[in-house]
Amino acid sequence: MAVRLRVKEVAREKGISMGKLHRAADVSYKTIKRIYSDPFYATTTITLGKLAKVLGVPPGDLIEEVPDSKEESNQ
């Protein structure tokens, strides 16, 4: 299983822009941009916690498990 970040989707649902998210969470704009462009980006739990707090969701709502491409090809 791989873990995919759902930050972009949750922020859109909440109507929060990348700029507002980076300022409110005190996370660099570069990191937010990377998370938005690469949902498999390996960020820290501290960053996820900050983003979750600003978005008003538990940190677990910002991630989801998806099958690895290797697992898909073996089935």
Task: Label each PLM-derived region with a short phrase.
Residues 11, 22, 52:
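The alpha-helix within a helix-turn-helix
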Residues 34, 38, 50, 68:
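Alpha-helical DNA-recognition elements
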Residues 63-75:
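Short, charged recognition helix plus adjacent turn
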Residues 1-15, 19:
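A short, Lys/Arg-rich alpha-helix, primarily the initiator
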Residues 11, 25, 36, 66:
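DNA major-groove recognition helix of helix-turn-helix
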Residues 39-53:
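Short, basic-rich loop-to-helix N-cap that marks the start of a DNA-contacting helix
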Residues 16-34:
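Short alpha-helical DNA-recognition segment
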Residues 6, 17, 44-47, 58:
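Residues that mark the N-terminal boundary/hinge immediately upstream of a DNA-recognition element
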